[in-house]
UniProtKB/Swiss-Prot annotation:
It is found in: Secreted. This is Probable exo-1,4-beta-xylosidase bxlB. InterPro entries: BXL, Fn3-like, Glyco_hydro_3_C, Glyco_hydro_3_C_sf, Glyco_hydro_3_N, Glyco_hydro_3_N_sf, Glycoside_hydrolase_SF, Ig-like_fold. GO terms for biological process: arabinan catabolic process; xylan catabolic process. GO terms for cellular component: extracellular region. Residues 1-21 form the signal peptide. Xylan 1,4-beta-xylosidase involved in the hydrolysis of xylan, a major structural heterogeneous polysaccharide found in plant biomass representing the second most abundant polysaccharide in the biosphere, after cellulose.
Amino acid sequence: MPLICIVYFLQYLDKIAISYASVTGLRESANLHGNQFNWVSTSTESIFPDCSTGPLSKNNVCDTSLDPVSRAKSLVAAMTLEEKINNTKYDSSGAPRLGLPAYNWWNEALHGVAEGHGVSFSDSGNFSYATSFPMPILLGAAFDDDLVKQVATVISTEARAFANGGHAGLDYWTPNINPFRDPRWGRGQETPGEDPLHLSRYVYHLVDGLQDGIGPERPKVVATCKHFAAYDLENWEGIERYAFDAVVSPQDLSEYYLPSFKTCTRDAKVDAVMCSYNSLNGIPTCADRWLLQTLLREHWGWEQTGHWVTGDCGAIDNIYADHHYVADGAHAAAAALNAGTDLDCGSVFPEYLGSALQQGLYNNQTLNNALIRLYSSLVKLGYFDPADDQPYRSIGWNEVFTPAAEELAHKATVEGIVMLKNDGTLPLKSNGTVAIIGPFANATTQLQGNYEGPPKYIRTLIWAAVHNGYKVKFSQGTDINSNSSAGFAEAISAAKEADTVIYAGGIDNTIEKESQDRTTIVWPGNQLDLIEQLSDLEKPLIVVQFGGGQVDDSSLLANAGVGALLWAGYPSQAGGAAVFDILTGKSAPAGRLPVTQYPASYVDEVPMTDMTLRPGSNNPGRTYRWYDKAVLPFGFGLHYTTFNVSWNHAEYGPYNTDSVASGTTNAPVDTELFDTFSITVTNTGNVASDYIALLFLTADGVGPEPYPIKTLVGYSRAKGIEPGQSQQVKLDVSVGSVARTAENGDLVLYPGSYKLEVDVGQDFPTATFTVSGKEKVLDEFPEPQQNATSAVTRRGR
């Protein structure tokens, strides 16, 4: 008997609390704070040391009148060599002799407090769930810096509550700010997109929200920018991240792979950085003194109190076991420590630092410095302070999953959803019967992506349809990556009995994830076959595409039987409800693609291992700056209304390189304001809507060849523009955004003629400006090492 579930709800449904229901086998919305999803739970106790009566109280680390470095030095000075080495691992053992408890540095909070490692969730009751926001790729599609900070602020509050409740540590290994360079990358979902300016602004506001300010003396939690650097390959065609050598030119490194990290460390003053699995130009990043010392700490000035570097988990082992950069564990431990890695998310440091010291591969002060950096961070976090003296120690369970947090998770999801096609099918008519078909039709945890924790509930598409007054016919039809058509007949039967058909599919973490890249960028399995058959029914058909990476939508865009197409990423707890807000017109779509949607053939034109951005004989170019044959371009997104854009001035300036490069503040000159460009955005349609103004710069003939097609230099999200109304939108452009990167990696302001354009796929007016004078170097890029020998002597090779 075919499984076609028809859901009827009585009028009193809304009067009762249902968060997990089974109606003829149909889940509407999963309540996750129970045992059924098998989240790990551990017994907990306070993570904080006893600085009042215990043996640690006699150490100056507990003296709140001293500065963090002095306090940390006092603690480290009291440790034996064995105790020091035992505390260089992520799950540090502490020092019972001193009254120093164990501490787990490995905590995750990519889009909400995430289960595992240092973070535990209870089976029920307090600390059994946390707010689950959309994955960064969908949050990035909102192009809303204020929203990013608001989300990060809630995450840090809940993270601090978990720490205060004994369920987590105080530092979190987030965010992932590697640019989404290749569409096959399995972890692109963890990033806000492909553009370095967008990533930089995202991370600045995220760190601001997570740490509660820019370089605060007392951070709420510690954020960790990862993975430093040029990391964006998992396991492609048998090439694994653990042994991959990313060969990157100084120009591409400075221009594309590093800006988000520069912003994170130099400007946002994050407290921690994670070095990555890969090698960079022959040197494992966690053993790369140029990367961790010359560039990071010296050139970017990231030497403030309590700033530390952790290796990715197992990365120090990879130095010798996979990269074969040194002969053994002792040399790998010394190479990483000497380069500036302070903490090992692995076992090489505790196992081999003793032997390495005996061999004279590093000195004791280098070890002390690493520990001082780590414990200075904990001092800043108030780890050793009385609870009454700490502004964040009072944060508790009552500040987790608040109504405001629920509302924000919903808002963030709605803002990010992108409409890729609409022939008038949307918004949906109210009421009636909808058939919801596909592998995401009744998805719950599948909507979360990765690095997730259990929320209180997850709203499915079916739950949302019912709560919007629709009768629902449900059939999965097929799986994400199946070639079986056994469920097609059931799906077609359900669709025939409905007024409207919604197909919910795409890709999930069985297709893309950490340790798993894609080899194709097509819709997997036979999903397109089922969509094709549904489209032949000549009923209104909407496709909702889930997943972090894009798939080639060419056939759906060309199919007249597909009336509308939405991309919803990984929307997490508010997923179904937010999607239906867009489908029904309760909210107007305004998100923009944060990545390029490439044609399926792209993967045959360039290997993932080619890190080059610019087009060449064996590379068609990467990202919207260098590739112009996209199925859908970076920044694409449709609305329920129409807009017109006009410039306040057709020509700006003039500008001179001397005056622009001289700066007006003590901030790095590349961060200073070049100018604020104003446009007028008018809603010429019939639906109130947000509008994301994307400002691109073109300058053929300016700077080194080849010239980028265009470059994003600013953006702003205008909120709630009513029909017939206009808003003035101001777009701040920094000096660094106008500059270009020379072949040696220097950031240079070039004289010449420049053109500004707004949006993609529109024929809006443009504006121009001219920069006169001589070339001005804004930032001299430190000369990278090339295939250098290790920081310790290589042996046995």
